[in-house]
Amino acid sequence: MKNFVIDQNLKELTEHRTVELPVACYKTTINQNINGYIPLHWHDEIQFVLILKGIALFQINEEKIEVHEGDGLFINSGYLHMAEEKEGSDCTYICLNVSPHFVLSQELYSSYVQPYMFSTNLPYLFLAGNQQWAKNILDAVKKINQLIQQKTSLYEIDITMQLTLMWKNLVVNGFQLEYDQSEMIKSHRMKQMLNWIHLHYVEKITLEDIAKAGQLSRSECCRYFKRMLNKTPLRYVMDYRIQKSLLLLQHPESNVTEVSYQVGFNSTSYFISKFQQAMNMTPLSYKKMNS
């Protein structure tokens, strides 16, 4: 069982190889995550995904994308996203996270990378394995994964060559970039509200509190959450508290009552009820299975 680590801002704490090689590449089986899915998060790195087995359902901002075996995604820097497997397909994929500054030389970054980082109409690109330009990118993802595993002589240089090839294919087959200030503001406000929840989830939280964090009215706040997460703000708070309880329940010395209060519930019975709804088992059953 793996724990997907994010900070209170929902920023993924990606582990890079070294400062000299700011690349993380690994295989992920979605249902082996502690939550059973990859929770909502974002990161500064750009991300390439290649589905090796099964079907993944990604949500990037408010859009949902189904990705099948042999296909993949490019996910841009800074965008909120999450993933779950579809229909018990035991989905496994390669995930490649790369610092944008490492894709091309610094001299080329401002012309060929930075415009893509700041565009507002490129949260992601679907990479269809039956299109040659996309296949070139996906093959390079596999090659980089092999290079990192094998660490043959000068493998770091080989990785930079593959990244250059990937980015050229993406740029040549991309589209007209757009820059919409209102979309930037929406994304920033959503992150502000989520960050506030993650800092205060152990406290009593009202809809007004969340809306205030995003400088929105209560109705606007609800529309943001409905559009981006397809749930109400307070339902998100509930789900986040359950998510935080999973790690605590795995500690051998923890007990259900203590955990319920540590994640913001003021009633153990209510915590048990909501946990069972979310996880299809009681907190105690989960603890026995995972501690």
From Swiss-Prot:
Molecular functions per Gene Ontology: DNA-binding transcription factor activity; sequence-specific DNA binding
CDD domains referenced in this protein's UniProt entry, alphabetically: cupin_RmlC-like
Keywords, comma-separated and alphabetical: DNA-binding, Transcription, Transcription regulation
Disulphide-bridged cysteine pairs: none
Binding region for DNA: 208-229, 256-279
Domain annotation HTH araC/xylS-type: ranges: 191-289
InterPro entries found in the cross-reference section: AraC-bd, Homeodomain-like_sf, HTH-like, HTH_AraC, HTH_AraC-typ_CS, RmlC-like_jellyroll, Tscrpt_reg_AraC-type_HTH
Any single Pfam family the record assigns to this protein: HTH_18
PROSITE patterns: HTH_ARAC_FAMILY_1 (PS00041), HTH_ARAC_FAMILY_2 (PS01124)
Designated name of the protein: Uncharacterized HTH-type transcriptional regulator YdeC
